[in-house]
């Protein structure tokens, strides 16, 4: 199963930043050069936000401190800070996709990694977002496709169906891994209640597998 990881920017916070940096908005026309990046994005139907103006500070929600997202996010934040014309981006540990969207919605953060399926749930008010749709964000960039892997040290577990009754780490609640796990289990007519679910990040899952505390991990 492949998922697309996206970098999101809270649209409401973007408006606040631009207003704070630029003073009172003006309706006067200027001879400023066109934003060719935005024009190109429009031609390719990408949903992006173009950030211009003076420097600012942005909080960047990533993932667990032992996972890929935090490491990648830290490198990305440093690259933007170094080359961002005065913009300082700080990578912050988080509980994953749902947490990142919620923190942006509360104006605690301005950037975040979110898997494309979780982004859709938030926008449409589905699953854990039911009744509370979040639409105040924009996609900055699509990053890369992901593959979901199930890891086990138990030779008797040969398929997803064999996870029934087992102790399985399915990621932090609300994370992209968590939603992936539920979807994969459902494809085999299993639910969260059919396993002894553990809600651990990648690092904790690896340690638990090694110590024999869990049977498998997503």
Predicted region positions:
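Extracytoplasmic/periplasmic mature domains of Sec-exported, cell-envelope-associated bacterial proteins
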Residues: 36-53, 78, 111-113, 133-136, ...
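Bilobed "Venus flytrap"/periplasmic-binding protein-like clamshell domains
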Residues: 55-83, 87, 146-213
């Amino acid at each position: 199963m492949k998922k697309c990881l996206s970098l999101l920017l809270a649209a409401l916070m973007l408006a606040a930043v631009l207003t704070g940096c630029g003073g009172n908005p003006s309706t006067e026309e200027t001879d400023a050069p066109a934003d060719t990046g935005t024009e190109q994005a429009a031609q390719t139907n990408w949903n992006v936000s173009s950030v211009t103006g003076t420097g600012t500070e942005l909080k960047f929600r990533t993932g667990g401190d032992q996972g890929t997202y935090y490491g990648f996010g830290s490198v990305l934040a440093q690259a933007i800070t170094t080359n961002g014309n005065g913009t300082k981006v700080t990578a912050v540990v988080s509980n994953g996709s749902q947490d990142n969207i919620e923190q942006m919605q509360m104006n605690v953060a301005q950037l975040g990694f979110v898997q494309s399926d979780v982004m859709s749930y938030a926008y449409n008010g589905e699953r854990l977002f039911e009744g509370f749709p979040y639409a105040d964000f924009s996609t900055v960039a699509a990053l890369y496709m992901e593959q979901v892997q199930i890891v086990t040290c138990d030779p008797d577990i040969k398929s997803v169906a064999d996870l029934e009754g087992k102790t399985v780490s399915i990621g932090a609640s609300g994370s992209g891994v968590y939603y992936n796990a539920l979807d994969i289990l459902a494809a085999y007519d299993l639910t969260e209640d059919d396993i002894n679910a553990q809600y651990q990040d990648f690092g904790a899952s690896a340690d638990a597998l090694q110590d024999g505390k869990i049977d498998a991990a997503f």
